[in-house]
Amino acid sequence: LLEFIDRGAPAAPSPRPVAGVASAPAAHPAAEPWPGDRVEPWSRIRKLTADHMLMSRRVSAHVQTLFEVDYTQVARIRAGKKQEFAERGVNLTYLAFIAKAVAANLRRHPRLNAAVGADTTILRHEVNLGIAVALDWGLIVPVVKQADELSLLGLARAISDLGERARTKKLNPDEVQRGTFSITNPGVFGSLAGLPILNQPQ
């Protein structure tokens, strides 16, 4: 170090001439329709969903694990409560039980209710459950705010109300914002399991 200080830094070598700048790889070409094909333009929400999901795969590593759950007890409780809920104008679905269990456990295990910052983990104080709703024109995720504070009846009512207003395009902008954890139910399509993409920044 002392020798470097006495003599100074060595002269920088002359830069070598650059033969040429390599061009960036071309983007993957979009598919072109063939004769007889029908072309359906994307709705704005479908385009936004596609862009958001592609961004999510770049931001977060997606790792899935599956568990088998015995629903015998839940099915028994649902059968006993279904009429009572119906008399209050609420359809008691299995999804309400899942939402109740998820909300309680997110409060108990806050790291599951976290978001990824630039170089931080943000542990959310609120437990706001997004409930994915598949529509003919796209996918939307209305949010049940403060879900951990709701009873089973309250959750079932909120899920039913938000789902119906999503299908009739009557949601307010704030009802699809500030979600901390989303639930999707691929079983409605008859599948055994689904591996959804994270809805950032959840």
Task: List where the protein language model places each region.
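C-terminal catalytic/motor cores of large multi-domain enzyme assemblies
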Residues: P13-Q202
